[in-house]
Design a protein with these regions (language model features):
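Helix-to-loop junctions at the C-terminal end of transmembrane segments
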Residues: 78-89, 295-307
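C-terminal ends and interior cores of transmembrane alpha-helices
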Residues: 99-118, 316-333
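Extracellular/periplasmic helix-loop-helix junction of adjacent transmembrane segments
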Residues: 41-75
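Glycine-rich segments within core transmembrane alpha-helices of 12-TM secondary carriers
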Residues: 158-182, 205, 378-389
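A late C-terminal transmembrane helix in Major Facilitator Superfamily
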Residues: 368-399
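Extracytoplasmic gate region of multi-pass secondary transporters
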Residues: 38, 241-290, 386-390
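Multi-pass alpha-helical transporter architecture, strongest
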Residues: 209-216, 412-440
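Cytoplasmic membrane-interface "Motif A"-like loop-to-helix N-cap segments
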Residues: 87-98, 304-315
Length: 458
């Protein structure tokens, strides 16, 4: 089997498969850590952010503030590492960010707690979270550029969907490890040292991902752009900013709903609905399995019918179902099986947005600014609508007493995304040999007309 680069030159499919694996492993590690942090948020709050005299709710808010701060460094990482990726290549930047992510996550597993070093503990944790935010900002743009630029014609949706799929696997792995540790250890062991094991497991996985990325080739788009000079032809800044803003609007629903259902849910169920730690983790696992189940089919479907209709369906379903879902979870009369099915379905609906999302963002930018542009659009959306989700929801519930806040938050963000998708449609794949060299203005104009059709298989 052969695949074709942007210049229609046949190449072996081995580099494409290697790129898919190397990009996926890095994404898995990044999101495994976020899954672990979310799952152990109540434990981390007690160990790092809850000195004597501080209430549990206040400690949890501080934990989510640290979580949000890391997200606000993602756009910085996307800008810095994205510019490097557009100048020197995707490969060296992806090597650098996986090393940074692995080191920061492993160090969290050996940090002293508040009981040992006092107020220094939360500052050390926050510093490592900042390093993770910087590396995560560079990871997404590089990984998606890597996967979609190696994708065969007409398969960018499927290849890009692997980024989201490994996000789901990472979150599932984090929640699964947390659930396993909660099962085999008692509460005291888990709180004092058990949670550290989940972070320390990052080290061997990170070393494996680093080895894979050291063996990568540079992407065909970047190599060909370097030869032709296209990577030095940067579009006007105002056009890039307009495309980034459009991208943020399209993916904010995916960001908000994804984090509400997949990351914030465990602590919400424990702190607001008095669920046990094991029950909260089970709900997260079910939601994440549903999320993973629809991502690849949604990406593949978007190669056939377009990114817009698939993502729009997911956004509208979140708007319609968020409040009924939360009311069902609050109802003591509803069986556990029914609640589990609805939680699974909530994750599956988010997968409809996450599957086509990476390819949609990649198709909005030419090679010369792709790493930067798609990375910034995703990082800005996540910084505001994901990183702040836990903080906003927890603080709002605490202040208002309204336990439906998570549903309103996810539904409102998806409503805005639906409007952005309706106004500016995405085709079945809009960059091609010529489109990849076009500036962002041409991409956006074509997008508003409905986009191009997928490239035929050669």
């Amino acid at each position: 089997m052969k695949v074709f680069s942007d210049q229609s030159r046949p190449v072996s499919n081995r580099p494409a498969v290697r790129a898919l694996v190397a990009g996926s492993v890095g994404n898995f590690i990044e999101w495994y850590e976020f899954g672990v942090y979310g799952s152990f948020s109540t434990v981390i709050a007690a160990e790092f952010f809850t000195p004597e005299g501080t209430g549990a709710a206040e400690g949890l808010v501080r934990t989510y503030a640290s979580f949000a701060l890391a997200f606000f460094f993602r756009p910085v990482g996307a800008a810095v590492f994205g510019r490097l990726g557009d100048r020197v290549g995707r490969r060296p930047v992806l090597i650098l960010v996986i090393a940074l992510m692995t080191g920061a996550t492993t160090l969290i597993g050996v940090l002293p707690t508040y009981a040992t070093v006092g107020a220094l503990a939360p500052w050390l944790l926050t510093f490592l979270r900042v390093l993770q935010g910087l590396s995560a900002g560079g990871e997404f743009g590089g990984a998606v550029a890597l996967m979609t630029e190696f994708a065969p014609p007409g398969r960018r949706g499927l290849y890009g969907a692997w980024q989201s799929f490994t996000v789901a696997l990472g979150l599932l792995g984090g929640a699964g490890i947390a659930a396993l540790l909660a099962t085999v250890l008692d509460a005291g062991q888990l709180a004092h040292w058990g949670w550290r094991l989940a972070f320390l497991l990052t080290l061997p996985a990170g070393l494996g991902a680093l080895w894979l990325r050291l063996r990568l080739e540079e992407t065909p788009s970047f190599r060909n752009g370097t030869v032709s000079g296209a990577v030095r032809e940067v579009p006007p800044a105002r056009e890039v900013r307009a495309a980034i803003a459009l991208g943020v609007g399209r993916v904010m629903g995916w960001s908000a709903a994804g984090y509400t259902f997949l990351v914030v849910l465990p602590s919400y169920l424990q702190s607001t609905l008095d669920a046990s730690f094991q029950q909260a983790l089970l709900a997260t696992v079910l939601a994440t399995v549903g999320f993973a189940a629809t991502i690849l089919p949604a990406g593949l479907l978007s190669d056939r019918v377009g990114r817009r209709p698939v993502m729009l369906t997911g956004a509208l379903l979140v708007v319609a179902l968020s409040v009924p879902l939360l009311n069902l979870l609050q109802d003591d009369g509803t069986s556990t099986a029914v609640k589990g099915a609805w939680v699974f379905g909530a994750g599956a609906v988010v997968g409809l947005m996450a599957g086509p999302g990476p390819a949609m963002l990649a198709e909005m930018f030419p090679t010369s600014v792709r790493h930067t542009g798609l990375g910034l659009a995703y990082a800005l959306s996540n910084a505001v609508f994901s990183g702040c989700a836990g903080l906003i929801i927890t603080e709002s519930v605490e202040r208002t007493g309204n336990v439906d806040i998570p549903a309103y938050y996810a539904a409102a963000a998806c409503a805005v995304s639906a409007l952005a998708l309706v106004k500016s449609r995405t085709g079945k794949g809009s960059w091609s040999d010529a489109g990849d060299r076009a500036d962002v203005r041409d991409v956006v104009r074509r997008d508003r007309r409905g986009g191009g059709r997928a490239e035929p298989r050669r």
